[in-house]
Amino acid sequence: MPKLPPLSLYIHIPWCVQKCPYCDFNSHAQKSDIPEQDYIYHLLQDLQADLQRFKDSIQQRKLHSIFIGGGTPSLFSAESIAYLLKEIKKQIDFEDNIEITLEANPGTVEAERFKGYVSAGIMRISMGIQSFNDDKLQRLGRIHNAAEAKSAVNLAKVSGLKSFNLDLMHGLPNQTLEEALDDLRQAIELSPPHISWYQLTIEPNTMFAYRPPKLPDDDALWDIFEQGHQLLTMAGYQQYETSAYAKAGFQCKHNLNYWRFGDYLAIGCGAHGKLTFPTGEITRFSKTKHPKGYLRGEYLYEEKNVPKIDRPFEFFMNRFRLLEAVPKQEFEDYTGLSQSAVKNQIDFAIQQNYIVENADSWQITEHGKLFLNELLELFLTEE
């Protein structure tokens, strides 16, 4: 019988001011007034339905973290966020040291709103900066400029937040090594507790997919990563996940729970959740993507059981994104499988120097990080 992992809650707010050309998230450009109050009502109804539907999994569990993502959640007022969190707490208990994060766009925040979010219960803000180069920001379709980004960061510092994150991208259209490193230097100078540093990828069904920009080649990308990683490390940021760097004590609890194969409720348009049951079942589910259907009360879109044969791949796909060692006991606890179920794959991975092991854990190697896809393919099941 699996041990139940920590339980988080993801809340999706789908609206944004305009759709960015690289974005493949479930986001909808704001064409008129956002039905803020109506949407909050439906989020709470959605949660209530899930707590009833999945009551055998939830039982007496408390929320470990909450992440409000989008879209651009900072389009919603602090009053709405305060009401939402207060009503959620009436339905399910919070752990004493819960982490509550809200995503914000530097172009949609101002001093009073940040302070209002803190009063509402937000402890951590994640800001979509992406770049401090105005030309690059324009090419990415962002609505803020570098000066507004820095202003937003400075507001975050004095707002009473426990932590904040800056999202930055590299490998941007026509970006040079020096431009990429300059973005990082400017971010480091602002001294955020956490930096997420992603490589831009062209996703299907985005504007960039239809009209692909010229991106740096693989050699240039490697130089950017290698020198950027060195810059961040020297500035006191520790890499703990493929794209995540944090000062000591400021790792994102919510994302760590995802990557450690934890459980998470999910409410809002297109949100995806995962729950483990005392019976050993693991369920994944998703919500109606379009706001029109969701606002009609059509919440649950799909629910499916994760068969035991698929669990090793799902577990390691998440776990090997982290640089920390993987406790063998957690594999058994969270998948309901014994280590013998993956012995052949593990032995081969060790032979290929993708991972090393000791009595208690498996650890991905530097070589394994470079060949992550090949490592994960070992755990894929044949159709």
Swiss-Prot record:
GO cellular component: cytoplasm
Binding site for S-adenosyl-L-methionine 1: 10, 70, 103
Top-level taxon of the source organism: Bacteria
PROSITE patterns: RADICAL_SAM (PS51918)
Alphabetical keyword list: 4Fe-4S, Chaperone, Cytoplasm, Heme, Iron, Iron-sulfur, Metal-binding, S-adenosyl-L-methionine
Name of a matching Pfam family: HemN_C
Necessary cofactors: [4Fe-4S] cluster
GO-annotated molecular function: 4 iron, 4 sulfur cluster binding; coproporphyrinogen oxidase activity; metal ion binding
Domain Radical SAM core as annotated: residue spans: 1-241
Protein name from the UniProt record: Heme chaperone HemW
Organism encoding this protein: Haemophilus influenzae (strain ATCC 51907 / DSM 11121 / KW20 / Rd)
Lineage: Bacteria, Pseudomonadati, Pseudomonadota, Gammaproteobacteria, Pasteurellales
Gene encoding the protein: hemW
